[in-house]
Amino acid sequence: MPKLKTNSSAKKRFKVTSTGKVMVTQSGKRHNMRKRNKRMLLVQKGYTLISKSKMRLMRSVMPYSF
């Protein structure tokens, strides 16, 4: 059986922690930032965890990360 390929766009966008959780950067921070207040910008800073319902999809997209 051949090796499974990892999706290239997924390996650039997602990060898997040592416990197996998948982290993704917050969306909505590319442009039109002046409309948002400072609190909203601080909330969107950093990473967030994906939901458990998306984990099955992530396992098929990045098979060797888990």
UniProtKB/Swiss-Prot annotation:
It comes from the Bacteria. Signal peptide: none annotated. Gene3D superfamilies: 4.10.410.60. The gene is rpmI. Keywords: Ribonucleoprotein, Ribosomal protein. GO terms for molecular function: structural constituent of ribosome. Belongs to the bacterial ribosomal protein bL35 family. GO terms for biological process: translation. Pfam families: Ribosomal_L35p. This is Large ribosomal subunit protein bL35. The keyword Ribonucleoprotein applies.
